[in-house]
């Protein structure tokens, strides 16, 4: 079978709350690590989320 173009990634909160989102990204077009600002419900504010591996 062929390797899939989209991979699942885990977006970890940089606030240190342990909260994370799981999303998909295209591994061919987005080769660098993903960072995005999203809402952290534990910290109750928008923080930066950085890409990490799904364990």
From Swiss-Prot:
Keyword Membrane set for record: no
Similarity section: Belongs to the bacterial ribosomal protein bL33 family.
Organism placement in taxonomy: Bacteria, Pseudomonadati, Pseudomonadota, Alphaproteobacteria, Rhodobacterales
Protein name: Large ribosomal subunit protein bL33
UniProt keyword terms in alphabetical order: Ribonucleoprotein, Ribosomal protein
Classification via InterPro entries: Ribosomal_bL33 (IPR001705), Ribosomal_bL33_CS (IPR018264), Ribosomal_bL33_sf (IPR038584), Ribosomal_zn-bd (IPR011332)
GO cellular component, one term: cytosolic large ribosomal subunit
GO MF entries: structural constituent of ribosome
Gene giving rise to this polypeptide: rpmG
Pfam family, one: Ribosomal_L33
HAMAP family: Ribosomal_bL33
Originating species: Ruegeria sp. (strain TM1040)
Listed GO biological process terms: translation
Domain of life where this protein originates: Bacteria
């Amino acid at each position: 079978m062929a390797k899939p173009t989209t991979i699942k990634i885990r977006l970890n909160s940089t606030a240190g709350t342990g909260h994370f989102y799981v999303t998909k990204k295209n591994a061919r077009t987005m080769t660098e690590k993903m960072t995005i600002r999203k809402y952290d419900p534990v910290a109750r504010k928008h923080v930066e989320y950085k890409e990490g591996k799904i364990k």
